[in-house]
């Protein structure tokens, strides 16, 4: 009898497992996935995808896949099944449906470096709270006053240190410029203080590992980034403790009282770990993209003398107007007058692609143009592929700021997504544009410059980088105001 029951149980189990396998297979095969190749086991095509390439091209990998499969294809990246989108319409759908159809999904290795509470990787209610803090911090009211003033002061500090006919590593100077702005606003750091320079050095090591291969081995960029993270957090925590102590003692500093660190300590219930990850991430986000865009502007402009001439005329007119009015510092009205400068900034962001792609995942089954994106799959909107598609931008690899003049703006705007889009659009977008414009204002009035190494082209690695540091030779611009 027992043998009969045992046989019945075994046969029933086999039948159930067969049915489960059959229905799972049916469910799996019902999707009409985009074409593509899943590459090698586990790693897929990650190394090909991340292979360094020119920042002003899609790169050989993307060009090859688009030629073979079209602008939407499947692959495996970072160990996950992934739909890659070089399609502007799908990218807009992804950005505009955050939390409805798609959500943030950065690789575990990136989350480990940026932290559990990073605004970039976290989702849900805590993300909304942290994002509201960052949006309030980078509000238009602060841009018009605090950030504009510090951007100008930092630009002048950097540019006034240059000597006639000297060679400058422009990439390093751009990083110094934007780092000083963001750390002044977040922690009231003095750009002349050695501790600010030491912190910037740690951030350089940190950034190199954020998007590196996640090999936690001695000497790897990933291991160095984890080490730098600890040092940076220790520095920030030290500043927090100093601030808390001074607040308790009733000692107030007008500058410190208005920075981000003081605000979150006084007006939020965030934990120490949440504040540490927030500050770490906001310095990273407010520094890297802005510095890359500033360096790219210095790279593109010498190849376009007509743009330099038009910029010079625009900024000389602003300077003459200020001199006549007895004003010295730039105002928000001055910034709004920089119409052609805004065209140059947009074109720099489009062609330079400071943000190449973002990480998302589908939280529902999505059907688009006949293809299925299964729930749970990673989705990778590739921004650079949209910006460099001739269907979206005429002669896309040509630096042409005039394409952004008012008559053309509306037709280009829907395909322009340098900072992502939707609810997760970069909170520092307007700050980055402001910083580049202010830097252009002063460098155009003070200097002529040319590239020392014409072969030192920007590459994506996957952050924007100049292998030789973008060396430029500067000459003083005669004062014509």
Swiss-Prot record:
Function: Involved in the biosynthesis of spiroketal steroid and saponin natural products from cholesterol such as diosgenin and analogs (e.g. furostanol and spirostanol), plant defense compounds used as main precursors for the industrial production of steroid hormones. During the 5,6-spiroketalization of cholesterol, catalyzes the hydroxylation of cholesterol to form 16S,22S-dihydroxycholesterol and, possibly, the subsequent conversion of 16S,22S-dihydroxycholesterol into 16-oxo-22-hydroxy-cholesterol and 16-hydroxy-22-oxo-cholesterol.
InterPro entries: Cyt_P450 (IPR001128), Cyt_P450_CS (IPR017972), Cyt_P450_E_grp-I (IPR002401), Cyt_P450_sf (IPR036396)
Annotated binding of heme, by residue: 426
Name by which UniProt lists this protein: Cholesterol 16,22-dihydroxylase CYP90G4
Gene Ontology cellular-component terms listed: membrane
Source organism per UniProt: Trigonella foenum-graecum (Fenugreek)
Topology of this chain in the membrane: Single-pass membrane protein
Tissue specificity comment: Mainly expressed in leaves and seed pods and, at low levels, in flowers and stems.
CDD domains: CYP90-like (cd11043)
A Gene Ontology molecular function term of the record: oxidoreductase activity, acting on paired donors, with incorporation or reduction of molecular oxygen
Family membership noted in the UniProt record: Belongs to the cytochrome P450 family.
EC number: 1.14.14.-
Keywords: Cholesterol metabolism, Heme, Iron, Lipid biosynthesis, Lipid metabolism, Membrane, Metal-binding, Monooxygenase, Oxidoreductase, Steroid biosynthesis, Steroid metabolism, Sterol metabolism, Transmembrane, Transmembrane helix
Domain of life: Eukaryota
Transmembrane segments annotated in the record for this chain: 4-24
Cellular compartment(s): Membrane
One biological process term in Gene Ontology: brassinosteroid homeostasis
Industrial or biotech use: The coexpression of CYP90B50 and CYP82J17 in the yeast strain RH6829, which was engineered to accumulate cholesterol, leads to the production of diosgenin, the main precursor for the industrial production of steroid hormones.
UniProt pathway annotation: Steroid metabolism; cholesterol metabolism
Pfam families (UniProt xref): p450
